[in-house]
């Protein structure tokens, strides 16, 4: 019999059945595999230990370390224990790669608003870059130039400038001569500025050229300043009268100092690990600022700890730098970036996006020009981003709003555990249809965001997660801990927490009996947050009494800082900050009000730009001062037919006060606040609270005592 070449098993009917069953089976497998993997991975994530208990010395408490750090880290790699050593090694390793970028200045103009106020608008071009090698050469030249202009290496240098490339260069240059740098916020008022410079006996002051006028007015009060080095700025003219009025102080430009150093090189004098690198003045909420002494070892150890938990950075990453470098959060972020070989593009909060206040209409904001992959933010900025996006969505209305709301709910379900969305199918769809345009607000390429400076609300965290498509690493730390305490990991989907301890330190909870927070509390231990390890700083400059009050060294030699914050540990070892000792007030009838907790809850109202809740022990209710969101309140007034000529007039109208208070009550109830925690009366304030006004810090946290002092009459009337 002739072979037909056909296998009886390959009959058309059976082949068709097998094909159908194969497709069905394949489909079932395709569905089941992600489901099963999702279940497994979700279980793994929920059960993953991010922090583990450890026995340490010192006061009794409940202590955690990072789960992947049995030993505390202190350096990112061998031989890099100080700032100049770390920077030089990075520059040699990445010599030809981009390091510092600054936008080209094209022109500026002033526009006049309807109320007569003038506003500066800038037209900025693309970024121009300097490589690691080029920046290192400038740093060495500046270091030599400092010595050549007569600065004694045993004296201190202060930097009083906005965040910019020259700030970074001057900072690194000082370290090559073992010079301690005093950092001062560019927004600091005259009294605090004079105090900071005289207290630390600064010899050389580095400033923006626009600060010369302020300095010329106070130069007679500066007891130890001998040299002023100003940073030239495009579009800012230096008045000869400002230079000539400095008396015996020598005034030079930074370019002159660099040229002098280039011609007359000086051998470096490198510091030790325990040498004081920085005296950083806190932007605290009470009294004159305190100078925190940060060592080279502190700066390097915190950077090493962060690098262990941040998704791998490399030369392909670009960081947008716009927060104040005088704040330890921004300073440490830039140290992490240059240690990783990434690029730093400088901007400002006033030119950050296409719609920022100082951006000329029709031109690009910093993030549009830079397209960063990494950025830092403080909660107040992210709250404004959220508010802006929601406002745009509301204005579009109709199908656009319906689509956004539906997409947001689907992505929210995915982040909270929907396997279908979590595996990227829905994510790709909604990103393409809805969220791509929203991401363009921050340049469209953000892959990781670091948030610190204050607690970020869970709603804002989820919103940024979904709309920007990037994980958020929320950190907790203080100037006194060199920004390093805890940091949430990129794969942790939880909100409202600040992660496990960084690998460079420990976090301990100590019972606070008076407040009712104990480490024996169930289901989670609670207490005052105490940070120990390599990131804990040396103490306060010229203030041993205060240093002894909050810094302790245990029998094993570990240094601890008592933060005054209250926290609790979750079962996976992550910290949640729940209170602050100073912010808890006992009302007349015995109820305790946590002011910070209430402010965080009420801040979710669409009408709130800023808020301070006030409680008086001799009264049975609390009150609030509210700076309303101008856009939101004016939109309501237009729709409600409430007429007004000025925003200040609108803030005085009873209808507006009632509308805002109802919104606050709704937000408070949604956050499950008790009735006594809700403000019984409020006052609307039309002027925003800014660092320049002295009512908020550079990280935009409220300065409670200053606000109470400025508005004491308004607060008294609320209790009348």
From Swiss-Prot:
CDD domains found in the cross-reference section = LC_FACS_euk1 (cd17639)
> For this protein, what reaction is catalysed?
a long-chain fatty acid + ATP + CoA = a long-chain fatty acyl-CoA + AMP + diphosphate
Instruction: Give the enzyme's EC designation.
Output: 6.2.1.3
| Cofactor(s) it depends on | Mg(2+)
Cross-referenced SUPFAM superfamilies: Acetyl-CoA synthetase-like (SSF56801)
Residue numbers binding ATP:
279-290
Residues bearing N-acetylmethionine are: 1
| InterPro entries (alphabetical) | AMP-binding_CS, AMP-dep_synth/lig_dom, ANL_N_sf
- Establish whether keyword ATP-binding is in the entry: yes
Please state the pathway this protein functions in, per its UniProt record: Lipid metabolism; fatty acid metabolism
Recall the GO molecular function terms of this protein's record. Answer: ATP binding; long-chain fatty acid-CoA ligase activity
What's in the GO CC field? Answer: chloroplast envelope; endoplasmic reticulum; Golgi apparatus; mitochondrion
PANTHER family, from UniProt? LONG CHAIN ACYL-COA SYNTHETASE 8, LONG-CHAIN-FATTY-ACID--COA LIGASE
Tell me, what does this protein do in biology? Activation of long-chain fatty acids for both synthesis of cellular lipids, and degradation via beta-oxidation. Preferentially uses palmitate, palmitoleate, oleate and linoleate.
Q: Identify this protein by name.
A: Long chain acyl-CoA synthetase 8
Look up and give the organism this protein is from. Arabidopsis thaliana
């Amino acid at each position: 019999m002739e072979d037909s070449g056909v296998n009886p098993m390959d009959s058309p009917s059976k082949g068709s059945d097998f094909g159908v069953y194969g497709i069905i089976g394949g489909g079932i497998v395709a569905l089941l595999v992600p489901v099963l993997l999702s279940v497994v991975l979700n279980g793994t994530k929920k059960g993953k230990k991010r922090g583990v208990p450890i026995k340490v010395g010192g006061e009794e408490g409940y202590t955690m370390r990072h789960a992947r750090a049995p030993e505390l880290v202190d350096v990112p790699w061998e031989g890099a224990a100080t700032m100049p050593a770390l920077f030089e090694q990075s520059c040699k390793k990445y010599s030809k790669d981009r390091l510092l970028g600054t936008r080209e200045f094209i022109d500026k103009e002033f526009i006049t608003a309807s109320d007569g106020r003038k506003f500066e608008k800038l037209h900025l071009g693309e970024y121009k870059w300097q490589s690691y090698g080029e920046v290192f050469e400038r740093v060495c030249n500046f270091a030599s130039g400092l010595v050549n202009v007569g600065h004694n290496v045993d004296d201190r240098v202060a930097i009083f400038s906005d965040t910019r490339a020259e700030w970074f260069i001057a900072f690194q240059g000082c370290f090559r001569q073992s010079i301690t740098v005093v950092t001062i916020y560019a927004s600091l008022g005259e009294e605090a500025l004079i105090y900071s410079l005289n207290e630390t006996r600064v010899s050389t002051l580095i400033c923006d050229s626009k600060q010369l006028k302020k300095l010329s007015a106070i130069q007679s009060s500066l007891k130890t300043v001998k040299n002023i080095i100003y940073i030239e700025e495009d579009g800012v003219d230096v008045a000869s009268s400002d230079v000539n009025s400095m008396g015996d102080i020598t005034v030079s430009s930074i370019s002159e100092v660099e040229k002098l150093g280039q011609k007359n090189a000086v051998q470096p004098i490198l510091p030790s690990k325990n040498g004081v690198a920085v005296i950083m003045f806190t932007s605290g909420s009470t009294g004159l600022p305190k100078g925190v002494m940060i060592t080279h070892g502190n700066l390097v150890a915190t950077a090493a700890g962060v690098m262990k938990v941040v998704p791998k950075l490399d030369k392909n990453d670009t960081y947008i730098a716009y927060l104040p470098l005088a704040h330890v959060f921004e300073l440490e972020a830039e140290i992490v970036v240059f240690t990783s070989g990434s690029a730093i593009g400088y901007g400002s909060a006033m030119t950050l996006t296409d719609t920022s206040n100082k951006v000329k209409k029709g031109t690009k904001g910093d993030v549009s020009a830079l397209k960063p992959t990494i950025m830092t933010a403080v909660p107040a900025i992210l709250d404004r981003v959220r508010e802006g996006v929601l406002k745009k969505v509301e204005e579009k209305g109709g199908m656009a709003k319906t689509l956004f709301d539906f997409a947001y709910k689907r992505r929210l379900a995915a982040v909270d555990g929907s396997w279908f969305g979590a595996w990227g199918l829905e994510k790709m769809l909604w990103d393409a249809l809805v969220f791509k345009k929203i991401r363009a607000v921050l340049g469209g390429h953000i892959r990781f965001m670091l948030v610190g400076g204050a607690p970020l609300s869970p709603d804002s965290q989820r919103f940024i997660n979904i709309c920007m498509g990037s994980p958020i690493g929320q950190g907790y730390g203080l100037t006194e801990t060199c920004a390093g305490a805890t940091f949430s990991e990129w794969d942790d989907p939880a909100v409202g927490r600040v992660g496990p301890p960084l690998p460079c330190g420990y976090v301990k909870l100590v019972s606070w009996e008076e407040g009712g927070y104990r480490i024996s509390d169930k289901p989670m231990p609670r207490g005052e947050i105490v940070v120990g390890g390599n990131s804990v700083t040396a103490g306060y400059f010229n203030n041993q009494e205060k240093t002894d009050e909050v810094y302790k060294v245990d029998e094993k030699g570990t240094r601890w800082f008592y933060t005054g914050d209250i926290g609790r540990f979750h079962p996976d070892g992550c910290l949640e900050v729940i209170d602050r000792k100073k912010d808890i007030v006992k009302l007349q009838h015995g109820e305790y009000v946590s002011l910070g907790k209430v402010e965080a809850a009420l801040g979710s109202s669409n009408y709130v730009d800023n808020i301070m809740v006030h409680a008086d022990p001799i009264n049975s209710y609390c009150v609030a001062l509210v700076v309303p969101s101008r856009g939101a309140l004016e939109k309501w007034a237009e729709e409600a037919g409430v007429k007004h000529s000025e925003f200040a007039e609108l803030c005085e109208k009873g209808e507006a006060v009632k509308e805002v208070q109802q919104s606050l009550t709704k937000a408070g109830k949604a956050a499950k606040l008790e009735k006594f925690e809700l403000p019984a009366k409020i006052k609307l304030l039309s002027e925003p609270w800014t660092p320049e006004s002295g009512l908020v810090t550079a990280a935009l946290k409220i300065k409670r005592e200053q606000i109470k002092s400025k508005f004491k009459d308004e607060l008294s009337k609320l209790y009348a």
